[in-house]
Design a protein with these regions (language model features):
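Ligand-binding clefts of soluble mixed alpha/beta catalytic domains
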Residues: 1-538
Length: 538
């Protein structure tokens, strides 16, 4: 394949300005992640007094040292619900994809160092997303749990949808994907069913507590008086009730047992041998990705400058470039994995939509994964665009994206507006994974445009009623609307709302995409031995 010849002036003022802005954006979200870590660390004395490890210490013992670990949705729920100061982001869950005894797994740990690991609406949403990732990518699930259960302040938002988590667990087991849970502390009410639906359960002696109704509720409901240990302690569940398969002496021992369980599973042995991969690094350093995207989002740039820094050897086979240059399609390899790319150089034209739809079908035909790089204001509007059939061709593109069965990866590197977000496989079109650069924006439209639209609509409404709208009121309406949409379109707002699986430093993009493509390739090759019911205890 031909190599892209970069035209980026890495010594120019624009590059320096772009780089500075991107570095500030990266530092901003890293600082927020550190605040969450610092908040959890404040609980260390309490955990040490109880003879327990902090959640991240448990996770560190669980994962293979030195192996890659991809944390997911670290800033989910940032400043939402009870997270007033931004130190409780993460949805009460630390989660990601990493290796345990050489097996790639989906791992999750209750962040009991913050609010006892109670489940918020964000925490539930994150849990459901993690389960979706496990099912789509055939990843064993290992959970380290210690949670006070649902945050009752949000019971109405959690209760009904919470059942999906249990249903997903049953389906994961029925698919033939193992689930291992270590109980480090309390896991009551709904949390108890999370354990019961796991295939392997490890309980920590003297710490694990599992029951449907705790001592206070039990006394209120039935008059029975029992201690939490008598009601649902680790020994009861391991020796009498049979809910647990293994009894651990402490946190570290529980994690050790989880590693041994995963290690004894013939998970990797069931995977057909795959050819060894080799690749060449891009001709241009990934460090330069910091300066590719203009600090001013209104300035255009060529998405191929990003491709040149993530593709093996910077090689890219451009598809129908002469037909439409604003929607870029073509073939490349990332760390040896072939994939088809769709990127934006501005709005999606009718021709670009038709081109992309055709390219997606070709990738589906050849079983080639798809990568979407977002930087679009949406579909081209206007009378000429309508005459050219933008609705017809745009619908065709969305139809192709929605029905493509090959793995789809999405990386938002700039703007992602309107139906362009849908056509480029945004969250609602179910990409296998979706990540965003910290400079990116996602919204139905720009704030300024939204403000002007509401102003015009309000003026016309008053005119129909024979009235004249107050100019000051219109100014305020336009300003407030623009500010609201702008604040809700930032990368931070999007990741807090779980519109993506996390923010990524542009310099890590190539490594991230290579890792994700490898996960997808392994999932496509892996056979599963499922059943119609899952594994139940008798």
């Amino acid at each position: 394949m031909p190599a892209i010849q970069s035209e980026l002036d890495v010594n120019g003022e624009d590059f320096a300005r772009n780089r500075e802005a991107m570095l500030a954006a990266v530092a901003g979200f890293r600082e927020l992640e550190q605040k969450v870590l610092d908040k959890a660390a404040e609980a260390r004395p309490k955990f040490e007094k109880r003879g327990q490890l902090l959640p991240r210490e448990r996770l560190a013992l669980l994962l293979d040292p030195g192996a890659p670990f991809l944390e997911l949705s670290s800033l989910a729920g940032y400043k939402l619900h009870d997270d007033k100061d931004g130190t409780q982001a993460g949805g009460g869950i630390i989660a990601g994809i990493g290796y345990i005894a050489g097996v790639r797994c989906l791992v999750s740990a209750s962040n009991s160092a913050i609010k006892g690991g109670t489940i918020s609406p964000t925490g539930l949403k994150k849990t459901l997303r993690l389960q979706q990732i496990a099912m789509e990518n055939k990843l064993p699930v290992v959970t380290l749990t210690e949670s006070g259960g649902a945050n009752l302040n949000y019971a109405a938002e959690i209760f009904v949808e919470g059942a999906r988590g249990f249903a997903n667990q049953a389906r994961i087991s029925a698919m033939g994907i193992p689930q291992v849970t270590v109980v480090h502390g309390s896991s009551t009410a709904g949390g108890a069913y999370q354990l019961g639906l796991s295939d392997y359960v490890v309980v920590v002696r003297g710490k694990a507590k599992m029951f449907l109704a705790g001592p206070p509720l039990l006394k209120a409901a039935t008059g029975e008086i029992a201690s939490d240990e008598e009601l649902g302690g680790a020994e009861l569940h391991a020796q009498v009730a049979g809910t647990a398969e293994y009894l651990a002496e402490n946190d570290a021992d529980g994690v050790r047992l989880a590693r041994e369980i995963v290690g004894m599973l013939p998970w990797n042995a069931q995977l057909p041998a795959r050819p060894a991969r080799s690749w060449r690094e891009p001709l241009y350093p990934v460090e330069e990705l910091l300066g590719v995207v203009p600090a001013d989002p209104k300035k255009p740039y060529d998405v191929r400058e990003i491709v040149a820094r993530i593709a093996d050897g910077s090689e890219f086979l451009d598809f129908k470039n002469e037909f439409d240059g604003q929607t870029v399609c073509g073939h490349l390899r990332i760390e040896g994995h072939a994939c088809g790319l769709i990127g934006n150089n501005g709005p999606i034209t009718p021709q670009g939509a038709a081109k992309a739809a055709q390219f997606i079908q070709l990738c589906e035909q050849s079983n080639t994964p798809l990568l979407f790089l977002h930087n679009t204001t949406g579909f081209m509007v206007g009378t000429e665009s309508e005459r050219q059939g933008v609705i017809k061709h745009g619908s065709k593109m969305i139809q192709a994206v929605a029905n493509a069965r090959v793995p789809k990866l999405t990386l938002v590197v700039g703007g992602s507006y309107g139906a362009g977000n849908y056509a480029m496989c945004g969250r609602g079109l179910d990409p296998r994974f979706i990540f965003a650069w910290p400079n990116s924006r996602t919204a139905v439209m720009g704030g300024a445009q939204a403000g002007k639209v509401l102003r015009i609509v309000t003026e016309e409404k008053h005119a129909k009623e024979g009235k004249e709208a107050d100019p000051k009121m219109l100014d305020m309406l336009e300003t407030v609307t623009a500010q609201k949409l702008d604040s809700q379109s930032t990368a931070l707002y999007g990741t807090a709302s779980l519109w993506d699986d996390g923010l990524v430093d542009p310099r890590d993009s190539r490594r991230l995409l290579g890792y994700l493509l490898d996960i997808c390739a392994e999932a496509e090759a892996r056979p599963l031995k499922g059943n119609s019911f899952g594994v139940a205890r008798f």
